Amino acid sequence: MNIPSIENCDLHNKAVLLRVDFNVPIKDGEIRDVTRILRALPTIQYLVNASAKIIIISHFGRPKARDNNLSLKNVIDTLSQLLNKKVKFIDDCVGEKVQKAVSAMDAGDIILLENLRFYEGEKENDANFARQLASLADIYVNDAFSCSHRAHASISRITEFLPSYAGFCLQDELKYLEKAVSFKAKPITAIVGGAKISTKIKVLMKLTEKVDYLVLGGAIANNFLSFSKVNIGKSFFQNGVDDLLHNIVETANKNNCKIVVPEDVLVAVNSDYSTSISRKTESILDGDIILDIGSQTLSTISSIIASSKTLLWNGPIGVFEHSAFASGTIGVMKIVSDLTHKGKLTSIIGGGDSLSAISAAGLTDKDFTYVSTGGGAFLDWLSGDEMPGVAALQKRLD
């Protein structure tokens, strides 16, 4: 894909507005997964070495108003430690305080601004807010693939006001995902998990046209089991989507894509998540809640993956946050990692929950061919949808 790269511009002593994705999971004040911060480091370090003045912007969570729990101040210490360099935090995004801080910067300095989503103009893709952000810098760099499916002020609108380029993380994401969706190395298996099937209808339709096996997990699998007249007890599923499921099944049959759903499951009874009970799918009871795949399904999925050349994975297979229901997700993760290390499988994994699952399995992104930082962005890319952030950069070449 042809997009402008930061390697093709003069950065010396220039103020660079760098859009990253520091929307990292935090619990009890601790960052649980630093993957997204790590992915931004090569671009930040490149800008430092090029003697630029780096102004970092990001969103964090989904605040409805200013909220200290969702302040980017929470990541400043970790960022400084990883860079081995002092990063100054400014508790605003625009305005006089920020302008003064930028004016005082020397080449190689780094400042981190406050959460973009504390401002309504960000999600509204507001031109005035984008213009205010742009006034801080000489150059804009997008290094947030995971946000580039959003038409937000700091992602797409801002490119109207500044020379705009892609950072290394964004470039890497596009390179690997373009390779993945070329669908050349067959057989291809896709694993799709998660809660709401309605958010993944488009990508499921696309995948049934391209892959050999579509493995379903999570509540999405519950929907398909229910559609097949299997009793799913009290398990979570989405109502009113049977017509969509029918279309997916028809498309899969037409394209010789085998849809794989659990043949056995691990369930909780009476919402007791501390203990799992194994059931064949035909033996699920009315009070059961399906929270993971069973051992036979894990074996089936393992065999399918072992026969594949390419794997695409979005969303966990089970509720891995509870140890009693983590064996499916972690088991498949370890099989995929092993085959990847042996050079037998190209593995592309995407989605915020997937990053957490990798950590839960005691693995890192180095154990797979590529781990995308994107969730919705990953799905949109697989679906073939235009991504506003990427399209905005491409327009700069016109």
Swiss-Prot record:
InterPro entries: Phosphoglycerate_kinase, Phosphoglycerate_kinase_N, Phosphoglycerate_kinase_sf. One of its GO terms (molecular function) is ATP binding. One of its GO terms (biological process) is gluconeogenesis. Its EC number is 2.7.2.3. It is found in: Cytoplasm. SUPFAM superfamilies: Phosphoglycerate kinase. ATP binds at residues 200, 321, 351-354. Belongs to the phosphoglycerate kinase family. This is Phosphoglycerate kinase. It comes from Wolbachia sp. subsp. Drosophila simulans (strain wRi).
